[in-house]
Amino acid sequence: MYFNNELSDQKVCLLRELKNLKYSDDARDRINFFLWELKFLDCFLHLKSFPFASECGMLHVSQKMIDIWKSHCSKTINGTILYYGKVPLNLFVNWKKVIWKTKQEFRAQYSFPKTPLAANKVIDDDDNTHSPKFVMEVIDVFVENLNVLMKINDPCSWFFVPGHMKEQIEQVLKELKLLRFFVCFVSNKCSIQPQYRCTTFYTHALIEASHIAMVVWLHLPIYGNVNQDLAPSEVSRLFSDFMEMKIKSIQPVISRNNIYIDVLQALKSTIPQAQKKHAAESSTVEIPTHSLTVGLSDQMANLQEMLCLLRDNLIHLPILDLEFHLQDMDSVIIDAGLLIYSLYDIKREKEDTVLDDMNRALGLDLPRNIEPIKVMVYLVMQKAIQCNLPKVHGLGYVDFLLKNLKDFQGRYSDSLAFLKNQLQVIQTEFESLQPFLKVVVEEPQNKLKTLNEDCAIQIIRKAHEVEYVVDACINKGIPHWCLERWLQDIIEEITCIKAKIQEKNTVDDTMKTVIARTSSKLARTPRMNEEIVGFKDVIENLRNQLLNGTKGQDVISIHGMPGLGKTTLANRLYSDRSVVSHFDICAQCCVSQVYSYKDLLLALLCDAIGEGSVRRELHANELADMLRKTLLPRRYLILVDDVWENSVWDDLRGCFPDANNRSRIILTTRHHEVAKYASVHSDPLHLRMFDEDESWKLLEKKVFGEQSCSPLLKKVGLRIAKMCGQLPLSIVLVAGILSEMEKEVECWEQVANDLGTHIRSNSRAIVDQSYHVLPCHLKSCFLYFGAFLGVREIRISRLIRLWISESFIKSCEGRRLEDIAEGYLENLIGRNLVMVTQRANSNGKVKACRLHDVLLNFCKERAAEENLLLWINRDQSTKAVYSHKQHAHLAFTKMDNLVEWSASSSLVGSVLIMRYNPYFARCPLYAVSHILLNFKFLKVLDLKHQVVIDFIPTELPYLRYLTADIGQNSIPSSISNLWNLETLILNRRSVVHKILLPSTVWDMVKLRFLFIPNFSPENKKALLKNSPNLDDLETLSYPYFARVKDAELMLRKTPNLRKLTCKVKCLEYLHQYHALNFPIRLEILKLYRSNAFKAIPFCISAPNLKYLKLSGFYLDSQYLSKTADHLKNLEVLKLYYVEFGDHREWKVSNGMFPQLKILKLEDVSLMKWIVADDAFPNLEQLVLRGCQDLMEIPSCFMDILSLQYIEVEDCNESVVKSAMNIQETQVEDYQNTNFKLVLIEVHY
């Protein structure tokens, strides 16, 4: 809508005067009020061509108001501003009085127009002001102006309207919006040439909207209006009467065969093809639904329920799916409208008419008329769920569903009673398909791979639907008739899937042997310390720059396109033994495109001084100062990987002091400008492409390992290597494909043909191909990495817990889910899709990994396409979220506020806060706890990054994974409502006070991982007597044991623990060395003392323990000797802050630690260490830190043939000397070329 020319000129003049002036909030309020009045007047003037505007006085009052403005107000206002040079507070007061007086004069005279509609027709001609669009624009202006009154709550504002009147305005707004939606619906469905009935309806709509706007304008707002002819209560009553008599769109001016019936009948006769967006469609359903509420809600409740369901689900349909059903929906909406308006017409004539009388009068069979609406409602609801399901998912979802079906039928037997038979059939059907799903996982490369995977995905999608139906039944969100029909359709579809499987003989031929067979495809042998291929000349030159060159600090910048191997090359140099031994400190960080300055500093400090010494609560500038002081006296090597901008180097370089001691920094970047900007002495290195020989050697190495390729394969292999464009990333990805295939020429030729046409022109093509050949059980695991954008390293323990909670891991009888998940990961590593960044020293298991940026971005984009993952940025608008499929199975966010998009995500399965945000550190995110209740299907909630919640959401029955910071010292007993929970990680900012754990936690029998710092059971007697065992619990962290009995009790309740971290206090059995029997499967034990005592009150008995850490205790040789008798499988022993008794002496006898591989002593008060020759026969690593009282390392370490590594830091000279003697003996006498000695001198 545009202003009338006269008004527009005056408005422009006024705004020009106000533009450069300063004015108060009160003045601004009055200016806005003035503009609000002008906007109403402009609309009324636009209606001057219609007879009804003159008849009711609308045109007359509007024109008079304009004359008043031109003759009095405009000159007064402009003159005042010119004179005073500012906006006085009373500027509009006099003019406002004039306006109100004029309104009073016309209020009593104004009446609803009686001119026949035919005389007021809106004609859709060349004049755009006479069209349905014009009607909607008029309504939009009225709605916008009325919304202003709804938003103002300040009683001093000129716009203020009391609350009881706001309720009336709110109802007016609702009616205007419904009327506007109906106009939109009719105009969208009309044929190109407008029909008489439609144009009559447009006029009717325009008259109604204009009339209500005039009434509102004449009476509101009332603030500051003295000598009113109506009191506020009378104005309120006027609105009530008006609402009853005039505005209801269901009450037409023409009774019987009214406008609404006429226009709907006209549309029904010629329903056109779908044209417009689905948003208008869902809103249009509101019209007959609302009419039902007003007129016949007592007799038409079922119809009302169906139309509400239709409205609520339309918004969740993608455009393409909606347009497919649009014509049918048009028919349903029109039929519903005709039915309702016809029934209302009869009832209005005769108030006591019953439903049967109406049916006879109209010749209707109401149940039969409602049936098509039922069908459409069901189809739309079903489609709204199906079209938003993930296109890929883990095959473990059926396992989760089957467990839940049993639990739900037990917990909600009354609600599910009417579906009991169908649910039992579905459960039986899914159980019968379990062997087939095992085949899909264990034989991914058989000849029926594509068919099997298609069927598997269909099965998983049906499992999702069953879950939704069961939940809807329990929560009474969908009528029973719809649920029964849905489950019956699911049963029939599962039957069809089974028939398809059996038709192709996949069940009969392969299921018989699947249980007895373990596939080698699930896992691979870990590849340790792989030698880098290629770039030998480059490595030698860079090594020389690192070890020699300028005496001052130097930056070695490596730049080049993605996939060249910059990071691999830099890491190769960073871990080179000759390089590492040259520097006192080595530290690295990965920047990426999105980074946190504090995270970078923490990463560097953890490498420089050890993770345990880093104070994470410090601010970034404090951490930077700590890093600078740590590096200053030493020669250091820093690796800064993947720098995108000069500003990153500006942030970091102040932390790297130049002590003129040949310190070096390796920097990798894609951009030459960044490399040049960071360079100091050495010129940036532009990393070249591989040559043909290097390309082939890398491909051969990745496919065959230490073996060589046959001559027949080499010919086609050389061609494939050349096709990769001399890009190392492409080569290793293709090698990952080839390594999964038979070593046959035909297979390799097929790969060459698949790659040949597009790999050179599209770098993503090879990634697409690598993804395409993945087995379906690995696709979701791989795409899940897209959630970790900007993460330097991904901890495997966390990744695997998330995979399990997401149902990506298919269970296998006799195997732990964690072990299966590790097999999946090794498979992805073997395909060169995942890079290992850290392995455990003792057993070689992967501890951390990362993806190349190219692969990471692919995962993010493809996961969005597959509706698996939706990454939402904090500044992303709600509209952008709605543009995606609203029910992506996973949602990841960096937003401060979940409110804006939570309403569209009720079916989301996961919410993860993936990056630190200062907002979260400043204050609790109170909204989160309440908003999370909207995510009723939530299975994973990871609020790890300093999101403090004010209470634990316990109404999420599907939740399997919860990580958050909490503010309270106790946990509610209602936490047991989270009966599906498997991982529970709750942190507190302060751990001074113990957290009380309710006894109901022990009812959560599915728990596998429990981490709560410094917790203590609330009711120990209840724990002993009433609670079940937590048989699935494998990791328990930070219980506080005040007595040995408490520890014994908890250990009895957790018989299958594998990892335990705890604090102990009690002094019982101090001199008796009472043996505390830990669970038989326990492999990792970390014990910390409380501040109250030093001695360990028990002897540790754990026959399968492999890792033991003791911190802060008083120990003696006798205690350690007795403990060692029960720990014959111990591989790692770490003693921190330990005080040795017996004159600070430790005697280790023969055979005491027969399997020990790693021994670490840090800040221990040990002076004399006596070790028998055969005490550590398999020791590989010895680390001594802060052992300043130790006299020397026993000489028997010279003869330990398995020894590979000794690290000495902050110890006296005699210890350093003995370490060097051991090195000499190991290397020169025993030719132990793998032995490495690291000496770190601490400067204060």
Swiss-Prot record:
<dbReference type="InterPro" id="IPR036388">
    <property type="entry name" value="WH-like_DNA-bd_sf"/>
</dbReference>
<dbReference type="InterPro" id="IPR027417">
    <property type="entry name" value="P-loop_NTPase"/>
</dbReference>
<keyword id="KW-0963">Cytoplasm</keyword>
<comment type="function">
    <text>Confers resistance to late blight (Phytophthora infestans) races carrying the avirulence gene Avr1. Resistance proteins guard the plant against pathogens that contain an appropriate avirulence protein via an indirect interaction with this avirulence protein. That triggers a defense system including the hypersensitive response, which restricts the pathogen growth.</text>
</comment>
<dbReference type="InterPro" id="IPR038005">
    <property type="entry name" value="RX-like_CC"/>
</dbReference>
<dbReference type="Pfam" id="PF12061">
    <property type="entry name" value="NB-LRR"/>
</dbReference>
<keyword id="KW-0381">Hypersensitive response</keyword>
<dbReference type="GO" id="GO:0043531">
    <property type="term" value="F:ADP binding"/>
</dbReference>
<keyword id="KW-0611">Plant defense</keyword>
<feature type="repeat" description="LRR 5">
    <location>
        <begin position="1213"/>
        <end position="1237"/>
    </location>
</feature>
<keyword id="KW-0433">Leucine-rich repeat</keyword>
<feature type="domain" description="NB-ARC">
    <location>
        <begin position="527"/>
        <end position="755"/>
    </location>
</feature>
<dbReference type="GO" id="GO:0009626">
    <property type="term" value="P:plant-type hypersensitive response"/>
</dbReference>
<keyword id="KW-0547">Nucleotide-binding</keyword>
<dbReference type="InterPro" id="IPR032675">
    <property type="entry name" value="LRR_dom_sf"/>
</dbReference>
<keyword id="KW-0067">ATP-binding</keyword>
<dbReference type="Pfam" id="PF00931">
    <property type="entry name" value="NB-ARC"/>
</dbReference>
<dbReference type="GO" id="GO:0005737">
    <property type="term" value="C:cytoplasm"/>
</dbReference>
<protein>
    <recommendedName>
        <fullName>Putative late blight resistance protein homolog R1A-4</fullName>
    </recommendedName>
</protein>
<feature type="repeat" description="LRR 4">
    <location>
        <begin position="1153"/>
        <end position="1178"/>
    </location>
</feature>
<feature type="repeat" description="LRR 2">
    <location>
        <begin position="1079"/>
        <end position="1103"/>
    </location>
</feature>
<keyword id="KW-0175">Coiled coil</keyword>
<dbReference type="InterPro" id="IPR002182">
    <property type="entry name" value="NB-ARC"/>
</dbReference>
<feature type="repeat" description="LRR 3">
    <location>
        <begin position="1127"/>
        <end position="1150"/>
    </location>
</feature>
<dbReference type="InterPro" id="IPR044974">
    <property type="entry name" value="Disease_R_plants"/>
</dbReference>
<dbReference type="InterPro" id="IPR042197">
    <property type="entry name" value="Apaf_helical"/>
</dbReference>
<feature type="coiled-coil region">
    <location>
        <begin position="526"/>
        <end position="548"/>
    </location>
</feature>
<keyword id="KW-0677">Repeat</keyword>
<dbReference type="GO" id="GO:0005524">
    <property type="term" value="F:ATP binding"/>
</dbReference>
<feature type="repeat" description="LRR 1">
    <location>
        <begin position="978"/>
        <end position="1004"/>
    </location>
</feature>
<dbReference type="InterPro" id="IPR021929">
    <property type="entry name" value="R1A-like_N"/>
</dbReference>
<keyword id="KW-0472">Membrane</keyword>
<comment type="similarity">
    <text>Belongs to the disease resistance NB-LRR family.</text>
</comment>
<dbReference type="GO" id="GO:0016020">
    <property type="term" value="C:membrane"/>
</dbReference>
<dbReference type="Pfam" id="PF23559">
    <property type="entry name" value="WH_DRP"/>
</dbReference>
<feature type="binding site">
    <location>
        <begin position="560"/>
        <end position="567"/>
    </location>
    <ligand>
        <name>ATP</name>
    </ligand>
</feature>
<feature type="coiled-coil region">
    <location>
        <begin position="411"/>
        <end position="434"/>
    </location>
</feature>
